[in-house]
Amino acid sequence: MKRNLIKVVKMKPYFAALMLSVSVLPAYAGPLGTADKADLPQSNVSSPMMAQSLRQPDLQPISTDRKTECFRLYTPDRKPGVNCVPDGSTGH
């Protein structure tokens, strides 16, 4: 009984912090967006559909001046029946 009580006492600060974060912190959160309803475009049947487009400053070129080098790794000659490891390419 005493052992379980010690575990509960150790966990109380954790649960207290969890309860505070769940109950109190959302009250301090600000609004998700700052756009007013007047700023949002109103759509109706007569207004044409408009696709979203990127502005020119949003497009930036990606530098492709990276240099890569390929290295060939040494692999020993595989001979089925001679090597201890069977050759996977021939199935032997």
Curated annotation (Swiss-Prot):
Region called Disordered, residue ranges: 36-62
InterPro entries, alphabetized: YjbT
Domain of life assignment: Bacteria
Protein keywords: Signal
Keyword Signal: yes
Span of the signal peptide: 1-29
Record field: compositional bias (Polar residues): 41-55
Family: Belongs to the YjbT family.
Protein name as catalogued: Uncharacterized protein YjbT
Native species: Escherichia coli (strain K12)
Gene of this entry: yjbT
